[in-house]
């Protein structure tokens, strides 16, 4: 795809404590590489990737294929950058909420991140995927899968255990979030309201019509 040659611009925000592996996770997703030497993110950064999303048609049949430009925002986890991070919440369509499977404290802090997210996101119930990263370090694990799944079930969101080092479930987690977003947009189109930051390319909503400009009712 050339610049501007896409149907949708979707912004995703990676959230979580400093050191949980947000930067390496996003780098694995966009470049399919692992770099353990990334330094701590200062403020906010982003990576980009073009993908094709195949919408589901009636009765589970294949629908139209949409070209999607993903912007994946990488946020600093330190407290001193929290006000800067929350300023980006309202522009994001979906959230990758991450913790470190080798850090119980990063898991406990998921609740704090959820509170901030719910208070600052574009709607009360945004699309979120919970991610337990560093699944490649089982000997150092401090958070068991049952704990994490119970928390995800409490919030009604999908949960994945991932590894930026091996690539385990990295694509699957992002693809699941994108699918949630696109399905929400389809529902919002039916109400003639979608977030005005979404459409960035040549076509309009999921039916190829001109997109409305209001934010989605969630």
From Swiss-Prot:
Reaction equations catalysed: GTP + H2O = GDP + phosphate + H(+)
EC number from the UniProt entry: 3.6.5.2
Binding, GTP: 16-24, 74-78, 133-136, 163-165
Annotated tissue distribution: Expressed primarily in testis.
Record PROSITE patterns: RAB (PS51419)
Leading EC class: hydrolase
Motif stretch (Effector region): 38-46
InterPro entries listed in its UniProt record: P-loop_NTPase (IPR027417), Rab27a/b (IPR041837), Small_GTP-bd (IPR005225), Small_GTPase (IPR001806), Small_GTPase_Rab (IPR050305)
Bias (Basic and acidic residues): 207-218
Annotated S-S bridges: 123-188
Residue numbers bearing the Cysteine methyl ester modification: 218
Pfam families recorded: Ras
Lipidation (S-geranylgeranyl cysteine): 216, 218
Residue numbers bearing the N-acetylthreonine modification: 2
This protein's UniProt keywords: Acetylation, Disulfide bond, Endosome, GTP-binding, Hydrolase, Lipoprotein, Membrane, Methylation, Nucleotide-binding, Prenylation
Subcellular location: Membrane; Late endosome
One GO BP annotation of this record: anterograde axonal protein transport
Predominant localisation class: membrane
NCBIfam families: small_GTP
Task of the protein: Small GTPase which cycles between active GTP-bound and inactive GDP-bound states. In its active state, binds to a variety of effector proteins to regulate homeostasis of late endocytic pathway, including endosomal positioning, maturation and secretion. Plays a role in NTRK2/TRKB axonal anterograde transport by facilitating the association of NTRK2/TRKB with KLC1. May be involved in targeting uroplakins to urothelial apical membranes.
Similarity field: Belongs to the small GTPase superfamily. Rab family.
Subunit description: Interacts with SYTL2, SYTL4, MYRIP and MLPH. Interacts with RPH3A and RPH3A. Interacts (GDP-bound form preferentially) with DENND10.
Record's protein name: Ras-related protein Rab-27B
Organism: Homo sapiens
């Amino acid at each position: 795809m050339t610049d501007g040659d896409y149907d949708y611009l979707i912004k995703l925000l990676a959230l979580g404590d400093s050191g949980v592996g947000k930067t390496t996770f996003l780098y694995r997703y966009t470049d399919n590489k692992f770099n353990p030497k990334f330094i701590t993110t200062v403020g906010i950064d982003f990576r980009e990737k073009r993908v094709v999303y195949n919408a589901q048609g009636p009765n589970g049949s294949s629908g139209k294929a949409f070209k999607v430009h993903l912007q994946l925002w990488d946020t600093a986890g330190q407290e001193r950058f929290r006000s800067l991070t929350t300023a980006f919440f309202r522009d994001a369509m979906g959230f990758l909420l991450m913790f470190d499977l080798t850090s119980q404290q990063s898991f406990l802090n998921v609740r704090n991140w959820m509170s901030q997210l719910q208070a600052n996101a574009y709607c009360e119930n945004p699309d979120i995927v919970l991610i337990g990263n560093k699944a490649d370090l089982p000997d150092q694990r401090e958070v068991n899968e049952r704990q994490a799944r119970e928390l995800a079930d409490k919030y009604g969101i999908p949960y994945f255990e991932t590894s930026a080092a091996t690539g385990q479930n990295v694509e699957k987690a992002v693809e699941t979030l994108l699918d949630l977003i696109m399905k929400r947009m389809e529902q919002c189109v039916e109400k003639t309201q979608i977030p005005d930051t979404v459409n960035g390319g040549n076509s309009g909503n999921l039916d190829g019509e001109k997109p409305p400009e209001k934010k989605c009712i969630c």
